């Protein structure tokens, strides 16, 4: 299973490449778990960089493993915080926490409300409030998005829209939560890799190894 392989590679890199002595640098963060096999991984990295820059004035140092050099991994411990994009990066983040006392936050956010909550969590670790204007903008957008469910009811929608979400574990988890928040019933949550490397996976997220079984599930959606 490729997710297990990614987990082991990330651990191998952070166990062997970083120098023993690391001098902390201010306003620097790392991203862990940006596998280029992930859907729109480069876009996610770009989005996290923009969020951290606007909210806290932080810049990215090392990104495992997207456009990162051996030297950057060698001094990965100089950053103040690690942002773990995927569950596969969690064990590596634990290693770095033990080696260099580096805190971390797990998962990239989906949706305005989740982004706001995520920024507040990061801010608590950094000891810095996120940018006030940015938070106000996100809060307004979150309110507008949440009102979509109410508008649909006012327009006389008789049937709740249903969806199936398929992808990597963190995408399925985050996107499903966002869809529920706007009034869409997520009927099926299908992970495209096994859950062996996931710590305490959500019970309603399934891994189906047989493609025909997955197709049969999706065919059922045509009748909803």
What are these regions (language model features)?
Residues 1-224:
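An N-terminal assembly and electron-transfer interface module characteristic of large anaerobic redox
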